[in-house]
Amino acid sequence: VPECRYPKQRGKNTIIKLMSRFRTFIRWAIKNKYMSHYPFVEYEMGTAIFGTPYYLTKDERNTLYKAKFPNNPALEVQRDIFIFQSFIGCRIGDLMKMTKTNIINGAIEYIPRKTKEGRPVTVRVPLSPTAKEIIAKYPDVPGNKLLPFISEQKYNKAIKKMIQLAGIDRVVTTINTITREEEKHPIWEVASSHMARRNLIGNLYREVQDPNLIAKIS
């Protein structure tokens, strides 16, 4: 029997993002004379609202890296990948495509997927001692993959579980994407692969406060 899934309610930010893309397409169609009527004349797009970015502090990151999960060794593998991603700051889609060939002269080099169709930019991130240590743990991953990746969905579930089991339960404030109301959650409950990017950017900004430098490696 096919699985029955009901559509989820979309948040205001998601609707704004989708409608913005649709508006861009409509403008292209009008410019190329595929249509003449512009349907967005009286449509108010609205403004996306985001809460304060949350991320693991250096101490929390180190606590997670040292945590042991004797009853779930597979979780320790995914923990290593999450810590590695927290040092590299790349998006999950870019991370999962990395192989050993992305290691060049003590750094990770890659072209972010989001820049490939516009102006391709090569990002170079020096490997920290911890990042090198993690890579050394997994020398023979099938397909020459950089690390033993699993699906993004399973990875996100593993991230929540590992942070919870490590006892990292600091409460953070988020914005509900549907109601736009403020909510409080333990950080493990709202953690995901995208938080790994914020782990790098947030901690780095505390030290250097140089947006240009941070942009070059994220």
Which residues does each predicted region cover?
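N-terminal core-binding DNA-recognition domain of tyrosine recombinases/integrases
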Residues: V1-Y54, A67-N71
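Conserved catalytic core of the tyrosine transesterase superfamily
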Residues: K66-I83
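Short, leucine-enriched amphipathic alpha-helices that occur as contiguous helical runs
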Residues: R61, V77-R79, N156, H194-R198, ...
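Conserved tyrosine-mediated DNA breakage-rejoining catalytic core shared by Y-recombinases
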Residues: E42-F50, I88, K97-A136
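Catalytic-site neighborhood detector that most strongly recognizes the C-terminal catalytic loop/helix
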Residues: Y55, K114-K116, E152-Y155, S218
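Residue-level signal for the short linker/turn that defines the boundary of a DNA-recognition helix
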Residues: R10, R79, C90, V208-Q209
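Short, basic (Lys/Arg/His-rich) helix/loop patches that form interaction surfaces
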Residues: P70-N72, D140-K145, K160-K216
